[in-house]
Amino acid sequence: MSINIVHSNENNEENTNIENWTTTGTNYRNECIARCGRLFSGFNALICMKPCGV
């Protein structure tokens, strides 16, 4: 299962870290949810969180 998270060009470092997150499970999920919470609100945040494994 591949997880693609591309919201903005905040910094390219984030894209290289995605593979590492998938190995940490809960840490990945929490970081993914937190990022969605910062970038979106309401229904859009929920859509963003779908691939987070919530």
Swiss-Prot record:
It comes from the Eukaryota. This is Putative uncharacterized protein DDB_G0289359. The lineage of its organism: Eukaryota, Amoebozoa, Evosea, Eumycetozoa, Dictyostelia.
